[in-house]
């Protein structure tokens, strides 16, 4: 009891190491490419870097410059370290998450000690999730426009879903377990 979060974080660890992450989705619909300021001791260390009008910033791989993360035509990077106009360093938020969860402390062996689920089974379940999400994707040839005004020629569905009910949230660390489940999705 109470070790569900460790199990879920181990799945995330395995998927990151297997490079089974839907980066296109993360770039399109999340703050994964938004730059996070890395300036130890500064008031805004750990906050999103923003432009003059409050827009979130990213590193555009096309222009090799800092850009508004919301603009159509921008190709945001999700990993790397970049220099802001004021000379400070920033990294995409996905980079911070990947750095944390790729650590061996979140691996299958570490989770097996806390959960009672073998490392072999954790890896197998992660592989099954990856297979369902990437090898059995559903593609609909339907044109649509996303939230940023970018035209899409197809819709991709990944047949993996989870729903956290009261059981998880009833535990003292339930909020963090639910958060981990949503990161996994």
Where are these regions (language model features)?
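Long, well-ordered, tryptophan-enriched scaffold segments
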Residues: 1-144
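A glycine-rich, hydrophobic/aromatic-adjacent loop/helix-cap motif
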Residues: 103, 109, 125-185
């Amino acid at each position: 009891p109470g070790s569900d979060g460790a199990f879920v974080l181990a799945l995330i660890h395995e998927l990151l190491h297997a490079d089974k992450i839907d980066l296109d989705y993360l770039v399109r619909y999340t703050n994964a490419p938004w730059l996070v300021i890395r300036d130890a001791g500064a008031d805004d260390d750990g906050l999103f870097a923003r432009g003059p009008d409050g827009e979130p910033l990213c590193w555009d791989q096309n222009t090799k410059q800092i850009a508004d993360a919301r603009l159509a035509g921008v190709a945001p990077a999700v990993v790397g370290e970049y220099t802001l106009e004021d000379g400070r360093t920033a990294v995409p938020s996905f980079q911070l998450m990947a750095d944390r969860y790729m650590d061996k402390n979140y691996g299958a062996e570490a989770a097996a000690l806390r959960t009672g689920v073998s490392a072999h089974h954790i890896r197998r379940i992660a592989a099954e999730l990856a297979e369902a999400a990437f090898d059995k994707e559903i593609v609909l040839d339907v044109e649509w426009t996303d939230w940023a005004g970018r035209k899409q020629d197809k819709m991709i569905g990944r047949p993996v879903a989870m729903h956290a009910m009261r059981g998880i949230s009833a535990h003292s660390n339930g909020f963090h377990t639910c958060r981990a489940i949503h990161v996994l999705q």
